[in-house]
């Protein structure tokens, strides 16, 4: 549904002009690339494990009639489309920080990730170097790390999806899914806790705590407590600067 709505908006925007419209078009092309990339990673083989003539996904690049039945593209065609959409998006996108919107740096990071899947390491490295050298984002400090996850527009978040108490706050959110007072579906295993104990100086170990879920004790992640204690309200961070490193 998200991809279909995106394509409908993109089709309508093709007849519009202006700087704001160009940025919108850039965001739409970048998001179309991301949607196809996510679908390819779930429903197709990894490029590094098969021939590029193997099956990819059904590409969605235009408004189709209701009785349309698509056929799967090859893996090569799939990744060609992903890279083509990012190439189209980049000159249209803003380089300013835009919380909740994908910008130039977010699209560049997604392209670097796609290049890694294609084992084009030199190209991926070039994109990552540009982001590290020229983008307005900074790595979290140790003091910032623990409290960064329930905040919006943090230094390291290149692209995040906005969630507010009125928009997108759902029980299928990352906060409700992981927290003991929600679904509590992400309790740490004993072997994982043993591994954490080997690294007492790792700040990320502080993101786990013992809690009780319906009478069952467990150790649960504390990343997504939610803004103002609302576990529904967490912005999923799609791209962070640390991933670029």
Language-model segments: residues:
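Second-shell loop/turn segments in exported
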Residues: 15-17, 64-75, 98, 113, ...
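Hydrophobic-face positions in mid-chain alpha helices that act as interaction patches
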Residues: 125-241
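"A position-specific structural signal for the A-helix of alpha-solenoid helical repeats
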Residues: 24, 31, 38, 103, ...
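Short, flexible, mixed-charge acidic loops at enzyme active sites
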Residues: 48-61
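Short coil/turn linking the two alpha-helices of tandem helical-hairpin repeats
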Residues: 40-47, 97, 117-119
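Conserved, well-structured interaction surfaces
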Residues: 1-43, 91-95, 229-241
């Amino acid at each position: 549904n998200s991809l279909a709505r995106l394509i409908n908006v993109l089709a309508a925007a093709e007849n519009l002009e202006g700087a704001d419209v160009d940025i919108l078009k850039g965001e739409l092309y970048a998001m179309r690339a991301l949607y196809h990339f996510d679908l390819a990673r779930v429903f197709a083989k990894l490029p590094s494990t098969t021939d590029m003539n193997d099956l990819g996904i059904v590409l969605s690049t235009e408004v189709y009639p209701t009785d349309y039945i698509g056929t799967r593209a090859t893996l090569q065609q799939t990744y060609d489309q992903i890279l083509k959409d990012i190439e189209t998006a980049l000159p249209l996108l803003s380089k300013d920080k835009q919380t909740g919107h994908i910008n130039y740096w977010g699209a560049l990071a997604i392209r670097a990730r796609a290049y890694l899947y294609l084992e084009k390491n030199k190209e991926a490295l070039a994109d990552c170097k540009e982001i590290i050298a020229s983008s307005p984002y900074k790595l979290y400090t140790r003091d910032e790390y623990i409290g960064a996850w329930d905040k919006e527009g943090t230094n390291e978040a290149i692209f995040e999806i906005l969630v507010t108490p009125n928009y997108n706050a759902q029980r299928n959110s990352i906060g409700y899914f992981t927290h003991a007072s929600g679904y509590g579906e992400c309790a740490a295993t004993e072997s994982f806790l043993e591994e954490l104990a080997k690294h007492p100086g790792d700040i990320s170990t502080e993101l786990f705590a013992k809690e009780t879920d319906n009478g069952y004790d467990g150790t649960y992640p504390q990343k997504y407590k939610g803004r103002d204690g609302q576990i529904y309200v967490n912005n999923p961070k799609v791209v962070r600067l640390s991933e670029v490193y």
